[in-house]
């Protein structure tokens, strides 16, 4: 046990208690000062307070060590001499979570190793920092060229691609690396909602119930709730979360609110990178289906809103801004391609057809129980493309303001140039559609 240093000779105060309480000046005469003599008071000089740090008192041992000592068991990793300093630990409870982390200042016992937080979390708690899910662009071992240069090779003779099972994802060592992403096949967004729900929903969830597309009443409810694309979001979660079934975070579905200690902006950005860059979704020889373009546009808009509302990252990552700008440029290019196809009279709107019943005319568009007439098809689609392009302009303006807040540099200048180019491309596309 720690022994305190011997006390020094007690030193009296410089003024008596009566003068100290009255806040008057004392002449410090002893045994009685002048003021106490006049007032006929008892002059008392109290002991002065000791200066310096207070003495260290022996700490009380933990309950776990007392219990092990009573039963005669002792952990071989810890020593128990009488004069050793005991281990000091503190418990931190995360708000909104059920997990208790223990920050340990010394060596841990065998019973406490299972609940002790790793050193990275210890440093984050002690320094007042926050957790961060790094994107692929933030990894120094992964080059940005590798992320956006996926091989477009697809085996011949295969019309569709199949998704790897969750067991295969769990067995992979690094599923977020570019080589692992190439080995995982993301299901291609089909040209109708029936194939999308039957292909992805049956493999991920093992559903056997009737498909909502076959039931017109259920189709409208499913379309309103936005659950048609839940299978695709689960597939993206399987890739970005190491095969674990995590809550979906996307612009289409309701985003998970940011907690006080967690940030999901980088995770959402990684999902967007997988969607835009994977060869199974974006092929060079064919146009991207229109419903896929609309889905990615909603994804970009949702991520932009989440990043602005996030109080942890506060839009300080230039890598995230660069990735968001590249993905937005891809969406703008796809919308411009749709506008050009409309002007040339070509048909690239197959993704909007959810065929509830065999249509009399193959060019009709069915959404739920609503049928869009052929004479209004081009004008309505053109108005939809204009609306989506105009909605992206405020995003570009906000990205320019966020970029000016950061420190100057080559990456900041590159982001500024990219944002200006994308904004000019949007304005040119709107002008072309007006003509």
From Swiss-Prot:
One Pfam family of this chain: Zn_clus
Source species, domain of life: Eukaryota
Entry's localization field: Nucleus
GO-annotated cellular components: nucleus
InterPro entries in the record: OAF3 (IPR050675), Zn2-C6_fun-type_DNA-bd_sf (IPR036864), Zn2Cys6_DnaBD (IPR001138)
Tagged with keyword Acyltransferase: no
Keywords: DNA-binding, Metal-binding, Nucleus, Transcription, Transcription regulation, Zinc
Location of the DNA-binding region in this protein: 16-43
Residue span of region Disordered: 49-103
Gene3D superfamilies: Zn(2)-C6 fungal-type DNA-binding domain (4.10.240.10)
GO MF entry, a single one: DNA binding
Compositional bias of kind Basic residues: 50-59
Note: Gene clusters encoding host-selective toxins (HSTs) are localized on conditionally dispensable chromosomes (CDCs), also called supernumerary chromosomes, where they are present in multiple copies. The CDCs are not essential for saprophytic growth but controls host-selective pathogenicity.
Role: Transcription factor that regulates the expression of the gene clusters that mediate the biosynthesis of the host-selective toxins (HSTs) AK-toxins responsible for Japanese pear black spot disease by the Japanese pear pathotype. AK-toxins are esters of 9,10-epoxy 8-hydroxy 9-methyldecatrienoic acid (EDA). On cellular level, AK-toxins affect plasma membrane of susceptible cells and cause a sudden increase in loss of K(+) after a few minutes of toxin treatment.
Protein's name in the database: Transcription activator AKTR-2
Organism: Alternaria alternata (Alternaria rot fungus)
Gene that this polypeptide is encoded by: AKTR-2
């Amino acid at each position: 046990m720690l022994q305190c240093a011997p006390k020094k000779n007690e030193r009296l105060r410089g003024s008596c208690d009566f003068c100290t309480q009255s806040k008057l000046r004392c002449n410090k005469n002893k045994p009685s000062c002048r003021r106490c003599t006049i007032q006929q008071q008892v002059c008392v000089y109290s002991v002065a307070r000791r200066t310096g740090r207070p003495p260290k008192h022996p700490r009380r041992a933990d309950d776990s060590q007392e219990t092990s000592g009573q039963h005669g068991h002792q952990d071989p990793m810890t020593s128990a001499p009488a004069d050793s300093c005991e281990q000091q630990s503190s418990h931190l409870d995360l708000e909104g979570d059920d997990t208790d982390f223990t920050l340990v200042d010394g060596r841990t016992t065998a019973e406490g190793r299972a609940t002790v937080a790793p050193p990275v979390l210890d440093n984050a708690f002690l320094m007042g920092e926050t957790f961060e899910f790094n994107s692929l662009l933030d990894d120094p071992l992964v080059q940005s060229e590798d992320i956006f240069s996926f091989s477009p090779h697809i085996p011949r003779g295969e019309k569709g691609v199949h998704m790897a099972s969750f067991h295969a994802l769990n067995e992979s060592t690094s599923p977020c690396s570019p080589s692992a992403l190439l080995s995982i096949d993301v299901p291609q967004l089909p040209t109708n909602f029936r194939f999308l729900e039957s292909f992805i929903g049956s493999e991920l969830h093992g559903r056997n119930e009737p498909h909502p597309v076959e039931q017109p009443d259920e189709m409208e409810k499913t379309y309103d709730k936005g659950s048609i694309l839940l299978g695709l979001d689960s597939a993206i979660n399987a890739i970005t979360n190491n095969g674990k079934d995590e809550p979906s975070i996307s612009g289409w579905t309701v985003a998970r609110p940011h907690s006080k200690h967690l940030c999901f902006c980088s995770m959402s950005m990684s999902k967007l990178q997988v969607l835009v860059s994977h060869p199974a979704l974006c092929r060079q020889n064919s146009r991207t289906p229109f419903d896929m373009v609309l889905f990615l546009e909603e994804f970009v808009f949702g991520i932009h809103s989440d990043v602005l509302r996030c109080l942890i990252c506060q839009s300080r990552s230039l890598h995230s801004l660069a990735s968001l700008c590249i993905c937005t440029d891809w969406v703008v290019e796809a919308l411009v391609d749709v506008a050009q196809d409309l002007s040339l009279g070509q048909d690239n709107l197959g993704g909007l057809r959810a065929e509830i019943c065999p249509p009399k005319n193959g060019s009709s568009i069915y959404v739920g129980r609503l049928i869009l007439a052929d004479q209004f098809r081009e004008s309505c689609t053109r108005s939809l493309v204009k609306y989506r392009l105009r909605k992206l302009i405020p995003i570009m303006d906000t990205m320019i303001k966020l970029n000016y807040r950061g420190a100057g540099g080559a990456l900041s200048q590159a982001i500024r140039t990219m944002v200006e180019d994308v904004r000019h491309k949007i304005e040119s596309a709107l002008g072309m559609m007006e003509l």
